[in-house]
Structure formats: C-alpha cells, structure tokens
Amino acid sequence: RFESGTLMFHLGMSGSLRVCKKDEELKKHDHIELIFNDCCVRYNDPRRFGFCLWYEGDDQDHKLLKSLGPEPLTGAFNFKYFKQAIAKRSAPIKNVIMDSKVVVGAGNIYATESLFICKIHPAKPANELNDDQIQQLLETIKKILKKAITQGGTTLKDFINADGKPGYFQQTLLVYGKKGEPCKVCKTQIESITLAGRASSFCPSCQ
C-alpha cells in the first residue's frame, strides 16, 4: 500500500515475488521490477496467468477482493460459516471448496487431497454433507494448507516459492495426479473425472 493507492498482484499458478539487490541480473520471466532505495522487488511468472494492477481506492473495496470468501487459515473460516456457505449448494463439493467466493486458496491439488483424506467423493453434492463431514473437511483443508506451506508449496512444473526454491509438498501427494496408480490406502486403482474443467483424482473404494 502507498499513500496514493495500492499495487495489487495476483500470482496466478506460477508467479512469484522476490526481494533482491538492484544490480542482480534479471532472470528469465522477470516481468515487473519495483525499485526501492536499497533493494528491488521483482515479479516473475513463467506461465503468465498472474497480473499486476494499480488501484487508487481502498483495496478491500476492489471488485476482485470484495467478493472473496475468507482466508482458510483464519478464524473466519469456521464450522458455522462453512455449513452456511454450502447449505444451499447442490454443486459437487470439490467445485464449491475451489470457489474463491466460498474460501480462497483451496486450489485443485489441496481440494483433491483434502477430500481423499475425508473419504468424500469429489462429485458429492455439497449440501448433502453431514455435520461431521463438514467439520472434518474444514479441519483437513486447514491442515493440508499448513503442511504445504511448511514444505514450500507444490512444484509440479515451474512453481517456485518466495525464496526462489521449488516446493516439496508434491512428494506427499496421495491422489492428485495419481490416476491409474494403486491407492496408498486400499490398493484400488485411482480414477479421475472432470469437474468444472479440472481433473479430479479419487479412490472409488475409499471415497
């Protein structure tokens, strides 16, 4: 935030911001450079799904932020909120938890893994979850995201974290991207369906 407005970044799928010395050589896919007195901040995005924009009003009033759901690791994402948010949603539960208007940050990988751990089929209508399933899914999403953060995120192709290093959460993935492989719990072959245009891996026995 600046006195005259806010510079907003969306990192997309592969974007990253890093602080570096002003004389440091530019890296491939460095697109934006913010120069300060003793350092600079560079925005790097190999896949170019992210963006940067300038907004002169209160950033919380911007249309891109105003409609967002709560951050998953805050107290705002709780049982009461989650139950109410899905109560009238008959869409597949995976689509609902990936909807940023419901909760932000639960992308395809983390939604897939959370549903597997909770033994919930990704296509199950959201409003058919019982209270125990809602509570377990809520807690699992939080745990999965915390674990991913401690491991630096998930690097599948070109993702790097703020330190310029790849993440290691992919080494612990249970079902995401495992189509055709045996389930690590019951050995049944992992299957995949498409929901809202995204591949959704699941175990037909466990879920």
Spans of features found by a protein language model:
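Extreme N-terminus of proteins, especially the signal/transit-peptide cleavage junction
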Residues: 1-2, 139
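Phosphate/anion-contacting hairpin/loop surfaces
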Residues: 3-105, 110-117, 125
